[in-house]
Amino acid sequence: MERTAGKELALAPLQDWGEETEDGAVYSVSLRRQRSQRRSPAEGPGGSQAPSPIANTFLHYRTSKVRVLRAARLERLVGELVFGDREQDPSFMPAFLATYRTFVPTACLLGFLLPPMPPPPPPGVEIKKTAVQDLSFNKNLRAVVSVLGSWLQDHPQDFRDHPAHSDLGSVRTFLGWAAPGSAEAQKAEKLLEDFLEEAEREQEEEPPQVWTGPPRVAQTSDPDSSEACAEEEEGLMPQGPQLLDFSVDEVAEQLTLIDLELFSKVRLYECLGSVWSQRDRPGAAGASPTVRATVAQFNTVTGCVLGSVLGAPGLAAPQRAQRLEKWIRIAQRCRELRNFSSLRAILSALQSNPIYRLKRSWGAVSREPLSTFRKLSQIFSDENNHLSSREILFQEEATEGSQEEDNTPGSLPSKPPPGPVPYLGTFLTDLVMLDTALPDMLEGDLINFEKRRKEWEILARIQQLQRRCQSYTLSPHPPILAALHAQNQLTEEQSYRLSRVIEPPAASCPSSPRIRRRISLTKRLSAKLAREKSSSPSGSPGDPSSPTSSVSPGSPPSSPRSRDAPAGSPPASPGPQGPSTKLPLSLDLPSPRPFALPLGSPRIPLPAQQSSEARVIRVSIDNDHGNLYRSILLTSQDKAPSVVRRALQKHNVPQPWACDYQLFQVLPGDRVLLIPDNANVFYAMSPVAPRDFMLRRKEGTRNTLSVSPS
């Protein structure tokens, strides 16, 4: 069959070809297919004759070989950074500069990068340079200067080593010698001056009163007494204007202003999985301060919702419903402002057990706010790896490009909307999962730079969103910020106790909201890498599998997804569970597609496709930090001690203390099943109960380090 003249073949412009090894470095090779302009045979060398009509009926292509560095030693990576072909591999430099600190310190990299400077000439002696020796024509130095310029521009915080700033001083000295008066030299000089002036101001001035996290927590001496509840209710009422006294627009705009300022200051390096996952290790208290600030703000907003709704137990149901409705309207306004961070924080609080179980209060909520609440909750549904929230964020990011394309010639360009401000936790989880799935080093002590490229794909999205957040035009409103700071925060125990005082368990709806079990870590890892193979536009893993029944410090609570109910009816209540009781989980998972794990890993059964020889179980630790789960693959050969050690490793508890813990299976009805120390867990566990397990310290053993999410 003949092909229509002038019609292009439907071939992929870039096709994988394989790998090549050269001098110990591994390259990925692909073939790039490009259109080529071919001159008609009738056209002379001068181009005076018109091209032949026959020439326009053919499309000419040329295929070029493209090599990108996949793995190499540090010296080779530095050489590629300086002398590599940036047109052929444009992502190498930004990926390297954003992730290099995972495998080499800044000072060490500068030692590789900066060539030694010649000694200064004796006084009165002038050294004449030939054209070859002239620095302006020295290709190597110009390449190094270009790299330093990009480094100073995109990652200036890498050179902040207080108080000496020795790394930045070395860069400034080199640029003053290699490129005096250049933009790069001026940038280094200006950056060093800014760092020194900032240090002087910190020494001379008192630290400003900046709100950096959750306000104080209300406490009572005897939580079971009625007098204590009355005192607690009185203590929870803040002095001065309360947050809900302001309009919906004002509160939503101030929350957006705080979120965008914190998100714009996030350092990309702190988001890397190898950095963020170590934040709770001993000696890492000050690690990732910019990311911690966003987490603290998220938890503060969630705490404000809990405090304002539960902080006045004496309110009647219609009055409490008005507070619920206002928070729903604030959440809707955050959605209109494209602030997904505060939107998720508000929804997480409204969906937490202490608020969600208030049947009478939800029953007094009007139909329209209730419908809005259900629609907003669908944004962060955990189905299909949080596909809904990811697609919405992609659409919001694409808004700017589509508006620019729609501008007609001669018309004024329309101003793109600001933002969006994303929920940073999704990106953090993606990066942690990438760090867990891919090794840092490959065989032969080669740095796995392909892993760094994948991390850069996520960091580049964060960087692009940070730039778009600069287009917001919001002004601070001090009274609202003061009211936000004055809102007392409730502990988890207080939230449950006040909720049960407001509506005793007997008055709660017996039917619990059916919360879909979060997709396991293994499944999301497999899904992400499988989607990357098929080049899906929305292929990135989702949030960690750590459902909680209420707000826990440092990580947002899980969002229960309620079934659709008739308009005007209150959402189903979680029932009368206590603080330590997990919410009931639904096992009706969507049918997953089988995915294959890369890197030669054995196939791990998915939750809906459990094999007869393996199970994916979830293990928590019985402590005061809430129900923090970690997923573990359990095979028919696993004994209790090995399961305990693996679970403690997932929870960042030192391994020598594994003998201090016992493994229990959590059964319905607040019952637990002790797994004997030498038992085969696969056969000792109850096959009909939910596969939730708990580690509990043996009696008489010493206290261990606190456990926190990683």
UniProtKB/Swiss-Prot annotation:
Annotated Low complexity bias: 535-553, 578-590
Gene Ontology annotations for the cellular component aspect, listed alphabetically: cytosol; plasma membrane
Pfam families to which the protein is assigned, alphabetical: RA, RasGEF, RasGEF_N
Residue span, Ras-associating domain: 613-700
Coiled coil: none
Region (Disordered): 28-54, 198-234, 397-419, 526-609
Modified residues (Phosphoserine): 52, 508, 512, 555, 569, 573, 591, 601
Ranges of compositional bias, category Pro residues: 568-577
GO terms, biological process: Ras protein signal transduction
Keywords, in A-Z order: Guanine-nucleotide releasing factor, Phosphoprotein
InterPro entries named among the record's database cross-references: RA_dom (IPR000159), Ras-like_GEF (IPR008937), Ras-like_Gua-exchang_fac_N (IPR000651), Ras_G-nucl-exch_fac_CS (IPR019804), Ras_GEF_dom_sf (IPR023578), RASGEF_cat_dom (IPR001895), RASGEF_cat_dom_sf (IPR036964), RGL3_RA (IPR030750)
Positions with biased composition (Acidic residues): 198-207, 397-407
Residue ranges of every copy of the N-terminal Ras-GEF domain listed in the record: 65-200
Matches recorded under Gene3D superfamilies: Phosphatidylinositol 3-kinase Catalytic Subunit, Chain A, domain 1, Ras guanine-nucleotide exchange factors catalytic domain, Son of sevenless (SoS) protein Chain: S domain 1
Region Interaction with HRAS, MRAS and RIT1: start-end pairs: 612-707
GO molecular function, one term: small GTPase binding
Highest taxon in the source lineage: Eukaryota
Signal peptide span: none
Domain Ras-GEF span(s) in chain numbering: 247-505
Keyword Phosphoprotein: yes
Domain remark in the UniProt entry: The Ras-associating domain plays a central role in the activation of Ral-A GDP/GTP exchange activity.
Record-linked PANTHER family: GUANINE NUCLEOTIDE EXCHANGE FACTOR, RAL GUANINE NUCLEOTIDE DISSOCIATION STIMULATOR-LIKE 3
Task performed by this protein: Guanine nucleotide exchange factor (GEF) for Ral-A. Potential effector of GTPase HRas and Ras-related protein M-Ras. Negatively regulates Elk-1-dependent gene induction downstream of HRas and MEKK1.
Name of the protein described by the UniProt record: Ral guanine nucleotide dissociation stimulator-like 3
Annotated organism of origin: Homo sapiens (Human)
